[in-house]
Amino acid sequence: DNLTIDEYSIEDVNMNKLARGIFDKKDNIRVSSNNEMTDGYGILKPQGNRIIYTNPSSEDGKEVDATTAVTNAINFLELGYNEDVSYQVTTALEGITILQQTYKDSIVFSKDGSAEITVEDNTNGIYRLTSPRRISKAYLSSKALGTYDIERIEYVINYLYKHVELKSVDDIVLGYEKSYNKSKNTCSYIPAWYIKYNDRYVSFKSLKEAVDKGERLWTGVK
């Protein structure tokens, strides 16, 4: 129903601004030659398409329950993340919270993790957090999706009914795949079906490929 592929310009997250938001010792932030930032406790560094935050002093705490983990994650993210991009919690486990970017009231996924935030914490606090290094900025263009570019929901449901354990399927959502074009320095949001299988969202395309090849399905299919 009038689905489109939407293209946006992208920009890097402001690391200095992020560091000032999340570090406790804001007057003691140091930057190394490889752009690693620290206040003597937490460490913030770019790595591929992601930004990695670690706090080694918090690693040895005890595991917290899922509800506590979500609360801790959201409180921490409000310090400096989420300013220009909306996210929602899609996975809540003991000590691990995963949030996906949202777009047009749906969930965004990416093969390189650039549409998700993963937060790991314990009784000592957040000790590792990975987040996107680049965010979409200005709308550029849209292209109508072809009739056969995406499966009909009836086909998706019928395929799942025939080929997977339905008790492992918690949700079916029409989301978006976030895809980067390095040469143009843009990103596109492409409509696609996603299945929540064994507590993790996977693309229907990836799940179908795995099933058709006779591979065993597991939580980490992307």
Specify the residue positions occupied by each region the protein language model found.
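Amphipathic N-proximal alpha-helical interface segments
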Residues: N34-P56, I96-Y139, K196-E215
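A sequence-composition feature that detects small, non-aromatic residues
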Residues: A19, A66-A69, A73, A92, ...
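Generic alpha-helical propensity signal that fires on short helical segments
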Residues: G21-V31, E116-I117, T147, V211-E215
